[in-house]
Amino acid sequence: MFESKYDVIVVGGGHAGAEAAAASANLGAKTLLVTMNLQTIGQMSCNPAMGGIAKGQIVREIDALGGYSGVVSDLTAIQFKMLNKSKGPAMWSPRVQSDRAQFALKWREMLEKTPNLDFYQDMVVGLIVKNNKINGVKTGLGNNIFSKTVILTNGTFLNGLIHVGEKNFGGGRVGEKSSTGITSDLESYGFVSGRMKTGTPPRVDGLSLIHI
């Protein structure tokens, strides 16, 4: 059962949120990770890989600072590859392909073993602000949870839309609902929101195509 007052509340349980929660808790702060689905903490949304050009260096830096991403990647790896080997060493970038299901499972397992860290499944719909200072979050189930600091790691879920062909519908990821409420709340405090798009093209076997 979560408590009503924390040092840090992390909103969102993706890779950024999981790392933020682990870092906060390991530094001794009483931390709460709030996510809409506890079963998808640390889940790989698309390509089940960590690292790559530029990103591989970031994962190594996180690892050097005591983060979990590199450890989880190693424990769930099915392939390691150094990219750009045809170029100079400064251009080399490590990448690991992981078992998607095991990756999320291992992330959750490591977080559950982290001291000072609690979990709560709910949607954050707004911030609690008093005298221009963050005091906590409001949730979709009507709970007010108080904290000294709030870290937002919402990923693609804020008012998320999924487009399939000419159709579109709300969702932060296929099969998961989008996060609503917090965007308009942030806008009421003067933040400006925009929309970015990412796409996953279909994988088609060229040998299956018939040329007419």
Region locations from a protein language model:
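Short hydrophobic core segments
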Residues: 11, 145-155
